[in-house]
């Protein structure tokens, strides 16, 4: 095996040449990241909360972990049941817990945030209540719906899956790099503002549905049709929350669909989900500004069709084209008949 070393005493990094080539060329990205690593004084430390059935970094799209690694973010596991949040924690990640936090664990997170902490949070619909986990969000002015969001605008959901949402992307520094892409959010819950919260809190929408969306409270038995008593409207699926008190700025970025980071979903939209998530993570910690160069892929790029696009092309191919051919045929027949 051959290895490439980037070294600037006392720091160095080493990786085999085989990692430069996957389904594309990644040499520029890895070398640029390595140079940044050896020339930086410190790398940000992010703690990944465990102990509640959370998804680990290895469970998610490799595009997400690659982007984190290229930013030289150091990630460590943190079991809140037994450990306090370390003083060097620049950010916490809560990734799709399947069981609730204890009250003590939730209070640890809230105390950390009240002292200027940062949190990147993804949740998944489980059908079970998690009051302690939800208390973290409610302390900062938002709650998640008990059901999932269903979209009825055919331009904003994946074909034949109205619960696989293609939300509107709002303008923000976090969303700039994906503004021209689709973001795919499967089985997402609505993020709703509380009726009252502290006036020091600012809640900004990142991803939103159309006004035609509704909340389905019983997705296991749903016919995916809106009823008269369905809660409808434009719902947030991703938000950025900030609060500044006594020169301490708390920041939370929350997305209500952890499935957006699965490899299959991320690949369906050519890595846009992982790019958004990685930008969200690095925006809240002290990452030295550098250019993250993605690998130059030799594979294909997926073409994403909404249900509306599928309907349009179906009409064109099933009715439009045959009709045109019939008209042309009739015109030719009439012309020959006159001759």
Where are these regions (language model features)?
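Residue-level detector of conserved catalytic or cofactor/ligand-binding positions
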Residues: 5-19
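Short, surface-exposed patches at the edges or C-terminal ends of soluble domains, predominantly
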Residues: 1, 16-339
């Amino acid at each position: 095996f051959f290895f490439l070393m980037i070294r600037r005493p006392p720091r160095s990094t080493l990786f085999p040449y085989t990692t430069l080539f996957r389904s594309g060329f990644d040499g520029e990205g890895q070398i640029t990241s390595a140079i940044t690593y050896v020339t930086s004084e410190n790398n940000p430390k992010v703690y990944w909360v465990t102990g509640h059935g959370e998804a680990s970094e290895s469970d998610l799209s490799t595009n997400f972990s690659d982007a984190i690694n290229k930013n030289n973010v150091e990630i460590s596991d943190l079991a809140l049941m037994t450990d306090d949040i370390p003083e060097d924690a620049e950010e916490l990640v809560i990734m799709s817990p399947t069981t609730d936090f204890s009250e003590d664990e939730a209070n640890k997170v809230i105390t950390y945030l009240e002292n200027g902490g940062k949190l990147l949070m993804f949740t998944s619909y489980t059908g079970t209540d998690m009051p302690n986990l939800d208390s973290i969000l409610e302390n900062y002015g938002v709650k998640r719906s008990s059901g999932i969001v269903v979209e009825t605008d055919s331009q904003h959901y994946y074909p034949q899956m109205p619960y696989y949402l293609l939300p509107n992307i709002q303008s923000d520094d976090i969303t700039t790099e994906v503004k021209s892409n689709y973001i795919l959010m499967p089985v997402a819950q609505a993020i709703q503002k509380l009726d009252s919260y502290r006036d020091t809190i600012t809640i900004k929408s990142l991803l939103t549905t159309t006004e035609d969306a509704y909340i389905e409270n019983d997705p296991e038995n749903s016919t995916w049709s809106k009823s008269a008593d369905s809660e409808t409207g434009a719902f947030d699926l991703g938000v950025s929350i900030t609060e500044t008190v006594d020169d301490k700025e708390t920041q939370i970025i929350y997305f209500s669909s952890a499935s957006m980071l699965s490899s299959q979903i991320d690949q369906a939209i050519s890595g846009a989900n992982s790019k958004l998530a990685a930008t969200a993570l690095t925006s809240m910690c002290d990452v030295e500004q550098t250019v993250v160069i993605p690998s130059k892929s030799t594979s294909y790029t997926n073409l994403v069709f909404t249900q509306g696009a599928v309907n349009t092309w179906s009409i064109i191919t099933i009715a439009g084209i045959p009709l045109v051919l019939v008209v042309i045929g009739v015109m030719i027949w009439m012309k020959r008949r006159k001759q």
